[in-house]
């Protein structure tokens, strides 16, 4: 730390690089790669790719959030914490919490539910098609109506997937707001 309680240049650079890298990764995974892969790969191949990428993605998000929280927390004067500093710390703590929930709890449950779904689908000859390529009635909708086990597995998968998506969006929003906070605190551009 430099004289006067200001973080050194290296600390500032590391904080900004880790935060912007995490946010960029989150933007890419959330809004680009998932949609491109979903529209271009067979369903089960898409699921396999996601099951390999997401553990790394969530753990990297968790690690980046931890590093950023440690950097910011070490720079704060805790006795004289301002509302602005507290809100920035809260955003990073929220990001760390949500990334940890995804990395350590939701990802494994979502993937297990997906594998169970895919097992039933493979038994029925489904999963090899690219989404949107099927003509006629939806075989997955028919399967839900015919097989209560499949319907229950699908509900379980979408419950975990929905919670994971909410946590991911929370991380993305927290990091984006923290980046905006850093930008607003800049004196020069």
Curated annotation (Swiss-Prot):
CC annotations in GO: membrane
InterPro entries: TMEM205, TMEM205-like
Keyword Cytoplasm: no
Membrane spanning stretches: 18-38, 53-73, 81-101, 166-186
Topology of the protein relative to the lipid bilayer: Multi-pass membrane protein
Location(s) in or outside the cell: Membrane
Disulfide feature: none
A Pfam family matched in the record: DUF4149
Alphabetically ordered keywords of this record: Membrane, Transmembrane, Transmembrane helix
Chief localisation class: membrane
PANTHER family linked: TRANSMEMBRANE PROTEIN 205
Family note: Belongs to the TMEM205 family.
Name of the protein in question: Transmembrane protein 205
């Amino acid at each position: 730390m430099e004289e006067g309680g200001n973080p050194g240049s290296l600390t500032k650079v590391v904080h900004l690089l880790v935060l912007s890298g995490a946010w960029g990764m989150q933007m890419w995974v959330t809004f680009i790669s998932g949609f491109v892969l979903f529209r271009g790969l067979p369903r089960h191949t898409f699921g396999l790719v996601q099951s390999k990428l997401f553990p790394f993605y969530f753990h990297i998000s968790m690690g980046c959030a931890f590093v950023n929280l440690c950097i910011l927390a070490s720079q704060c004067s805790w006795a004289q914490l301002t509302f602005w500093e507290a809100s920035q710390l809260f955003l990073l703590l929220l990001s760390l919490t949500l990334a940890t929930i995804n990395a350590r709890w939701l990802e494994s449950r979502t993937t297990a539910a997906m594998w169970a779904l895919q097992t039933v689908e493979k038994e029925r000859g489904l999963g090899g098609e690219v989404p949107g390529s099927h003509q006629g009635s939806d075989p997955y909708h028919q399967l839900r109506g015919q097989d209560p086990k499949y319907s229950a597995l699908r509900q379980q998968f979408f419950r975990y997937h929905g919670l994971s998506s909410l946590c991911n969006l929370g991380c993305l929003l927290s990091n984006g707001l923290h980046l905006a906070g850093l930008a607003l605190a800049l004196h020069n551009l």
